[in-house]
Design a protein with these regions (language model features):
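ATPase catalytic-site recognition across NTP-hydrolyzing enzymes
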Residues: 1-54
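Intrinsically disordered or highly flexible coil/loop and linker segments, enriched in small
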Residues: 2, 12-16, 62, 104-108, ...
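Short, flexible loop/turn elements at secondary-structure junctions
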Residues: 10, 27, 56-58, 87, ...
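A general structural signal for short secondary-structure junctions and capping/turn motifs
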Residues: 41-44, 56-57, 101-102, 150
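Gly/Thr-rich phosphate-binding beta-strand-loop-beta motif of the actin/hexokinase/Hsp70
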Residues: 43-71
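Mg2+-dependent endonuclease catalytic cores in nucleic-acid-processing enzymes, primarily RNase H-like
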Residues: 72-166
């Protein structure tokens, strides 16, 4: 792991849980493939329901927010519509960013990592979005999320814009 994290040596695809070929199948030209998506509009998906996932900022790492459009039909595709990172925001600032996204999208579900300091962001978001879901991470919860992502990626049921390289 030292070589991967600090020496810029890549993990062998055979040793990775997410295979490169599977990940590449999830990459689409969102501007043309997603007919209901207008990225530069005030409301890029109009009234299409979306979910927000939020990992609050701790001390020096960035906070991360994703907007996901769940499938409209059984067995359909989950689309990662938007992703943002924030740095240097206090709890109020982080909650305001989430509220901004609630104005931009038809948000029907928000899940926040409320482990540790994330509790404060969760409490603030709950004031304007009472249905917010609190996630308290454990080894079991993380394993469950990775396995679900593996399943979606292996079956090409997750998509994101091919212009994203991070």
């Amino acid at each position: 792991q030292f070589e991967n994290l600090l020496m810029c040596q890549f993990v062998n695809d055979g040793d990775s849980i997410f295979k490169m070929a599977e990940l590449q199948r999830c990459m689409v030209d969102a501007w043309t493939v997603w007919q209901d998506y207008t990225p530069l509009a005030a409301r890029p998906l109009g009234d299409v329901p979306v979910w927000i996932g939020y990992d609050p900022s701790r001390s020096q790492d960035d906070a991360s927010l994703v907007v996901i459009a769940p499938p409209q039909v059984e067995g359909g595709v989950f689309r990662i519509i938007d992703k943002q990172s924030f740095n240097g925001l206090d709890f109020d600032g982080q909650a305001r960013k989430i509220r901004d996204f609630c104005r931009m999208y038809n948000v029907v579900h928000i899940a926040i990592d409320a482990t540790g300091i994330g509790q404060a962001v969760y409490d603030l978001v709950r004031q304007f979005f009472p249905r917010v879901r609190k996630i308290l991470y454990s080894v079991e919860a993380k394993n469950e999320m990775v396995l679900k992502a593996k399943q979606l990626i292996a079956h090409a049921r997750l998509q994101w814009d091919n212009g994203w390289t991070d």
